[in-house]
């Protein structure tokens, strides 16, 4: 008994004084102060994980973390899931591994032929984030990649909050660097592509982030110090890479990575890196050029001041300083810089042109006159200087000399509409009306081709003042109005031109488009819609006759014939002969084959169309319809499974519309239960889409979910009033036995759309269901005044129980 009690006391005091130490769980969302160097040979100390996704793969080995990109135009990253950092020093050694091509693929284009990188991030193609890698369309970053930048880029994402908010620091295989803040998938360039001078296949990329300051270094060389306060929260760190349009496969190796987040060490590193004595003059020059190209002239001017304190300016530096001063409207400073450049090289045309522009902007006409007189021979051979001669003569009220100078400038550069505009204005002042009109027309054609609609507006106003009834003036005005969305004014101009028998194919084509648009406004007036349809066809046919070698006109003519259920073989064949690689033409061929139940021909055309237009949902819709008619609709479902990353490119780009498309296909096939979840997915993407709400309601009616359908229709009605929604609400009310509500709904619809015969027919059917033949007869008497058709006569027989009257002659 004593021993047992002693044992109990011993266990009690042991548990009380010798408590077991429990290791608390690690919070990987914690903001930590540490120095950490990655050991990629160890799972615990590497932190990054191996993974695979859509078009990319990460693999960890003894030499580092390798990110493989398996297709062109891909931007992917792999997030380090351990801890968050705000102020830190990141150092990464990145190796660019050679690009490869799969068998049978064409070799890479030279840099001069590289396509531009798209300009915006594609948020729809990114799967979920941490710790997995993320793949997107390589849009990096807001502007075209310079030809010398290379074929790909790799780097770090830091302060990574989620897949749409982070900073991105990338260096290309050509040795160019850039920094962006990405917020809500929108890239905000902080430093555009800047040449670092690095040329090896291995880059040591360093970043020092302290508050709103970011110091960037490549291979221990200072590149820039950037200030930005867009993202001030701590975030993860990611290894990222982009593959552009040259190599099909690219791989990038993060062979070494270290991170320092201890405040004292970070501050020390920042001060050391930004010591003026450690920064070479060439770095200030390259940074100033990049900042000026980005439109940040004030920052560029600050860098030029630092550069001037370190070295003597040459021609390149003076020209850049002058350009930066002009951008800030510091024309005195610009004049000084360009004069210095001319001292360096008296024959430098760029300096001469820039100096002339700076003098003109200052209204320094005496200096400008001296400059042009000194370089008279050169001025007479250069379009810009001739234009300045015109400005000088105009300032001195020498209008004849000004007109001659502007005309000479336009002869030297016939693609510059402003020179023609200046000449026209002077000729008009001199009373040379016809010459002025011709000069204005030259300017108008150039502005229209360049889509310079503000300048074109000025020209059109002048032309309409000089000769408003001239055919060319009406044509230019109509095209301007059409391009700027003023379709009613454009219709007025084109209607007058076409009635006068215009010989301009573009006028007839645009007139046809406007008539097609007007056809849609006659939804409840069938005769007017048919008349517009016929006139549009005639307009497209006339455009084809005037421009027989334009595939677009033949395509539109064929399309109008197809929509009218007429033979379109001849114009379609002609369009294909002129433009065999036009995906829309192959899509129309597929639609025609589908109508004719020629499934093999439709499949062949759609295969070609989908290859040419991979992101167009309309083409995918026709493919789905083909499979539906073949009885293979279920085979199309994998194309819409975005969660498994096997979705079609068109689905990824437009999820809501794509899900809606598949739901409609199931509905058309009578598979209402299969359609319902796809309608739900579509509405989750676009909850305010009226068409989706209505189609979902129609599907619910088929499933006898009448209360659900009623709620959907009421929501659609709150967004947009349409006769079809009123009709469906009445149908649901009638099926629920609420005939008074159905009657009131249809009566209100008849009041709102008195020309819509469909609503009145539904009201007559409702009265027949309610056995109220008197009200049905009253509505039929109104209907027969608006429509004379077989269905109206059939209603007469139902109402009056007699043989319907014979059709009128």
Swiss-Prot record:
Query: Which stretches are annotated as coiled coil?
Result: none
Q: Does the keyword Protease apply?
A: no
Specify whether Amino-acid biosynthesis is a keyword of the entry.
no
Sorted keywords for this record are: Repeat, TPR repeat
What Pfam families does its record include? TPR_16
InterPro entries according to UniProt: TPR-like_helical_dom_sf (IPR011990), TPR_rpt (IPR019734)
Start and end residues of the TPR repeats are 315-348, 383-416, 418-450, 471-504, 513-550, 552-582, 583-616, 656-689, 723-756
Region described as Disordered: 103-125
In terms of PANTHER family, this protein maps to: CELL DIVISION CYCLE 16,23,27, CELL DIVISION CYCLE PROTEIN 27 HOMOLOG
The name this protein carries in UniProt is TPR repeat-containing protein TP_0920
């Amino acid at each position: 008994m004593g021993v047992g009690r002693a044992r109990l006391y011993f266990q009690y005091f042991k548990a009380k004084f010798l408590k077991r130490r429990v290791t608390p769980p690690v919070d990987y969302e914690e903001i930590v102060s540490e120095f950490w160097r990655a050991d990629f040979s160890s799972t615990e100390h590497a932190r990054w994980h191996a993974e695979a996704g859509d078009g990319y793969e990460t693999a960890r080995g003894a030499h580092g973390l390798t990110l493989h990109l398996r297709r062109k135009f891909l931007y992917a990253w792999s997030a380090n899931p351990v801890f968050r950092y705000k102020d830190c020093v990141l150092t990464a050694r990145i190796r660019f591994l050679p690009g490869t091509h799969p068998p049978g693929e064409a070799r890479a284009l030279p840099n001069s032929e590289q396509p531009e990188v798209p300009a915006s991030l594609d948020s729809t193609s990114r799967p979920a984030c941490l710790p997995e890698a993320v793949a997107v369309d390589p849009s990096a970053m807001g502007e075209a990649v310079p030809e010398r930048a290379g074929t790909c880029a790799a780097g770090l994402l830091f302060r990574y909050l989620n897949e749409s908010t982070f900073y991105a620091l990338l260096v290309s295989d050509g040795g160019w660097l850039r920094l962006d803040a990405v917020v809500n998938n929108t890239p905000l360039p902080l430093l555009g592509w800047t040449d670092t001078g690095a040329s090896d296949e291995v880059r040591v990329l360093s970043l020092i982030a302290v508050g709103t300051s970011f110091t960037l270094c490549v291979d221990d060389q200072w590149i820039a110090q950037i200030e930005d306060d867009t993202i001030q929260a701590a975030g993860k760190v990611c290894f990222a890479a982009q593959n552009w349009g040259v190599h099909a496969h690219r791989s990038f190796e993060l062979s070494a990575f270290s991170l320092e987040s201890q405040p004292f060490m970070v501050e020390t590193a920042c001060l050391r890196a930004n010591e003026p004595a450690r920064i070479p003059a060439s770095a200030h020059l390259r940074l100033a050029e990049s900042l000026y190209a980005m439109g940040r002239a004030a920052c560029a001017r600050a860098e030029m001041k630092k550069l001037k304190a370190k070295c003597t300016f040459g021609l390149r530096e003076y020209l850049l300083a002058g350009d930066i001063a002009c951008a800030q409207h510091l024309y005195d400073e610009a004049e000084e810089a360009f004069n210095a450049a001319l001292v360096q090289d008296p024959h430098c045309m760029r300096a001469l042109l820039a100096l002339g522009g700076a003098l003109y902007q200052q209204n320094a006409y005496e200096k400008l006159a001296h400059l042009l007189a000194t370089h008279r021979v050169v001025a007479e051979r250069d379009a810009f200087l001739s234009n300045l001669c015109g400005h000088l003569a105009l300032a001195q009220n020498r209008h004849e000399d000004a007109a001659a100078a502007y005309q000479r400038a336009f002869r030297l550069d016939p693609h510059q509409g402003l020179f023609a505009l200046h000449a026209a204005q002077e000729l008009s002042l001199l009373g040379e009306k016809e010459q002025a009109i011709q000069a204005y027309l030259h300017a108008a054609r150039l502005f229209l081709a360049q889509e310079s609609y503000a300048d074109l507006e000025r020209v059109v106003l002048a032309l309409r003042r000089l000769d408003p009834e001239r055919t060319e003036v009406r044509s230019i005005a109509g095209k301007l109005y059409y391009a700027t969305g003023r379709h009613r004014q454009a219709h007025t101009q084109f209607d007058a031109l076409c009635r006068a028998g215009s010989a301009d194919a573009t006028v007839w084509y645009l007139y046809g488009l406007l008539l097609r648009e007007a056809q849609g406004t006659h939804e409840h007036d069938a005769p007017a819609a048919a008349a517009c349809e016929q006139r549009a066809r005639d307009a497209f046919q006339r455009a084809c006759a005037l421009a027989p070698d334009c595939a677009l006109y033949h395509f539109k003519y064929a399309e109008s014939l197809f929509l009218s259920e007429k033979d379109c073989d001849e114009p379609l064949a002609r369009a294909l002969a002129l433009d065999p690689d036009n995906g829309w033409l192959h899509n129309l061929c597929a639609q025609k084959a589908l109508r004719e139940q020629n499934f093999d021909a439709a499949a062949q055309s759609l295969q070609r169309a989908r290859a040419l237009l991979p992101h167009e949902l309309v083409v995918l819709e026709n493919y789905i319809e083909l499979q539906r008619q073949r009885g293979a609709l279920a085979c199309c479902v994998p194309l819409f499974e975005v969660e498994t990353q096997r979705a079609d490119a068109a689905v990824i780009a437009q999820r809501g519309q794509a899900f809606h498309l598949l739901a409609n296909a199931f509905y058309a096939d009578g598979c209402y239960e299969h359609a319902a979840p796809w309608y739900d997915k579509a509405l989750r993407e676009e909850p305010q889409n009226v068409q989706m709400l209505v189609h979902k309601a129609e599907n619910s009616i088929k499933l006898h979910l009448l209360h659900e359908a009623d709620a959907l229709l009421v929501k659609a009605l709150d967004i947009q009033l349409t006769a079809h929604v009123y009709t469906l609400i009445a149908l649901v009310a009638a099926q629920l036995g609420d005939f008074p509500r159905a009657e009131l709904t249809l009566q209100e619809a008849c009041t709102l759309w008195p020309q819509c015969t469909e609503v009145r027919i539904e009201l007559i059917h409702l009265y027949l269901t309610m056995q109220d033949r008197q009200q049905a007869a009253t509505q039929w008497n109104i209907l027969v005044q608006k429509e004379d058709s077989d269905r109206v006569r059939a209603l007469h027989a139902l109402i009056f129980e007699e043989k319907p009257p014979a059709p009128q002659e």
